[in-house]
């Protein structure tokens, strides 16, 4: 129901309509309408109000629209694309599996001193734990999604895109891949091929139901590399082979520690590995340690350090030391237990100590690309293709011949055999050893 104006106020307003402006009478019938238009038309009380009744218009206060802040993601996407910095804004990355040393030498330092030494390595630990969490999240996705019928290129690129997305470094701008990303190319070695195989451009290989595939990839943050590997098989007949190698790796990890001789670790690994046998299609095979493959130390920016960890018993008296980072990896085989170079090369790495003059212009240009994008981190031909490099094979072979770049051919046992691999990165800290790459899967 519309409100009415008081009678006295109405009379005053009607008299006002006949008032003069500057002593002159306003034109009859027009002044009210013109004044009404100037004052904004009809009053707020609606069309039934008298034209002479004007109620001042109030400006509506505009409510400020506050944009709702997007909630930070709390879980990884599928495929993995959520940055680690979003999932862990305070950089409180999960700690790896911490294990007490079996043969702790109490005379070395007091517990307080060792804890102090651990605290000095905060950047070191943060980088390693971030890289390890990226590895866990990407491999978790890979284990769920890799299926027979997929091409090896699709599998490799899926893993590598996940790593790059989670580090936030896609490696397409000069120097970006040196800040974080792939620690080395994704190895997808099948059946009798034990290591160092990744598809080159145009590769048409497809994963088969009967295949046993080693998935070996590295993640680095600021040059600190986590190296970890697992084996996938889709037929239960290979279960004992995978169990033998996984348990051998765990035994090596358990034995590792400050002042432990690497030759002794090799003996423990071999004993566990070769206690297994596997029956495949009616034939029983002993599982053998591949005697010419080893674990190794990891240096900053370099996947292979100076020390090795054999996977068979040896007389090597080299000791693990505080501050070392080791990749403890084991390989088991139903074949000869010995590998040789074979097949097309895909893995390469620049040597850190090479300084040889080059004559070939293509080699000089390629070396410049390698220095600016990979440094001494391993790379593969697909990575050069991805950077837009073309017709580089002549220059690459020249760098290999000159000893500036090292080629890593695929390593194979005898045809018809099956090989498996499991690997962990461990930090030899002053107080404990930390199995940095440990996850719920292995």
From Swiss-Prot:
Against CDD domains, the record matches this protein to: MetAP2
Its source organism is: Verticillium alfalfae (strain VaMs.102 / ATCC MYA-4576 / FGSC 10136) (Verticillium wilt of alfalfa)
The protein's name: Methionine aminopeptidase 2
Main location, first listed in the record: cytoplasm
Q: Which GO terms describe its cellular component?
A: cytoplasm
Question: Which positions are annotated as binding a divalent metal cation 1?
Answer: 216, 227, 423
Q: Which family does the UniProt entry place this protein in? A: Belongs to the peptidase M24A family. Methionine aminopeptidase eukaryotic type 2 subfamily.
Q: Where is this region: Disordered?
A: 1-81
């Amino acid at each position: 129901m519309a409100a009415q104006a008081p009678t006295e106020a109405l009379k005053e307003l009607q008299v006002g309509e006949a008032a003069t402006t500057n002593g002159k009478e306003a034109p009859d019938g027009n002044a009210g309408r013109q004044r009404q238009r100037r004052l904004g038309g009809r009053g707020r009380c609606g069309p039934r109000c008298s034209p002479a009744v004007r109620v001042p218009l109030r400006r509506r206060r505009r409510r400020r629209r506050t944009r709702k802040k997007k909630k930070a993601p709390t879980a990884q996407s599928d495929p993995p694309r959520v940055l680690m910095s979003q999932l862990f804004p305070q950089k409180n990355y999960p700690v790896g599996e911490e294990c007490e040393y079996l043969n702790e030498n109490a005379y070395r330092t007091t517990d307080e001193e060792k804890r102090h030494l651990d605290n000095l390595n905060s950047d070191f630990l943060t980088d390693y734990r971030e890289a390890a969490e990226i590895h866990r999240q990407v491999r978790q996705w890979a284990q769920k999604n890799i299926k027979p019928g997929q091409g090896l290129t699709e599998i490799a690129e899926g893993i590598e895109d996940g790593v790059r997305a989670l580090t936030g470094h896609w490696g397409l701008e000069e120097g970006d891949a040196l800040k974080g990303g792939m620690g080395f190319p994704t190895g997808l070695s099948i059946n009798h091929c034990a290591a160092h195989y990744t598809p080159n451009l145009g590769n048409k290989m497809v994963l088969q139901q009967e295949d046993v595939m080693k998935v070996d990839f590295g993640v680095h943050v600021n040059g600190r590399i986590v190296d970890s590997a697992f084996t996938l098989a889709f037929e239960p007949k290979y279960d004992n082979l995978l169990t033998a190698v996984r348990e051998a790796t765990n035994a090596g990890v358990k034995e590792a520690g400050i002042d432990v001789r690497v030759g002794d670790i090799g003996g423990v690994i071999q004993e566990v590995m070769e206690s297994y046998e596997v029956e495949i299609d009616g034939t029983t095979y002993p599982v053998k340690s591949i005697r010419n493959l080893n674990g190794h130390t990891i240096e900053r920016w370099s996947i292979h350090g100076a020390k090795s960890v054999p996977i068979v018993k040896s007389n090597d008296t080299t000791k693990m030391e505080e501050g070392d980072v080791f990749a403890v990896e084991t390989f088991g085989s139903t074949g000869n237990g010995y590998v040789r170079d074979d097949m097309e090369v895909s893995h390469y790495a620049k040597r850190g100590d090479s300084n040889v003059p080059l004559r070939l212009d293509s080699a000089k240009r390629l070396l410049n690309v390698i220095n600016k994008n990979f440094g001494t981190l391993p790379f593969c031909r697909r990575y050069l293709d991805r950077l837009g490099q073309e017709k580089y094979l002549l220059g690459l072979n020249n760098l290999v011949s000159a000893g500036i770049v090292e080629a890593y051919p695929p390593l194979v046992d005898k045809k018809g055999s099956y090989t498996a691999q499991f690997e962990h990165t461990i930090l030899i800290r002053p107080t404990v050893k930390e199995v940095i790459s440990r996850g719920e899967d292995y």
